[in-house]
Amino acid sequence: MMSETSWQSDVVDYITKTRFAVLGYVRGDRTLLLRSMGSFALSGFDLYFSSGKDAPKVREIEKNPQVSFFFEHDNQNLETWKSVLVLGRAKLLTTGTEYENAIELLSNRNPHFKERVAKGEMVNTAIFKIKTQEIEYLDYSKGFGTVNKYQLS
């Protein structure tokens, strides 16, 4: 098992260096849906992400807030393959300090998002916070098939 600080810094570093991730959520008819996401940012191990306000996923996540976010870099070698899976509950943010913090973090990470903020387009944007409950960190450099699971709450 990895040391507490080692896995934490490895996971934060890996997520920070990931350009696109995959959001997993369950639709009302219990079908699992996956969506590529480029607008996300970490706050500790919790995660903010944005979407078009009218996107069907916004309504579906409000109904069933249990979601996952999968991070995997392109062009990896199998011997050193890594990925991170974040599992938690998503909450729609609309106002307040946490909402403002999310906008700042998303703007710092994503120039396109920052541009939308500058143009006053936030009225068309939904901002979510995932309260991370579990992290799965796959790291084949520690042995083929090595997946460490960490419960956060």
Language-model features: locations:
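Charged, gly/pro-rich active-site loop segments
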Residues: 2-3, 82-153
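A generic "binding-loop/recognition-motif" signal
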Residues: 53-54, 133
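Extreme N-terminal tail/first-helix region
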Residues: 1-21, 148-150
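Generic structural signal for secondary-structure transition and capping sites
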Residues: 19-20, 66, 111, 135
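Short beta-strand segments
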Residues: 19-53, 61, 67-73, 81-84
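Short, surface-exposed beta-strand-loop junctions and turns on beta-sheet-rich folds
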Residues: 55-57, 76, 143-145
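Activation segment
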Residues: 51, 58-59, 94, 139
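Alpha-helix boundary recognition
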Residues: 15-16, 62, 107
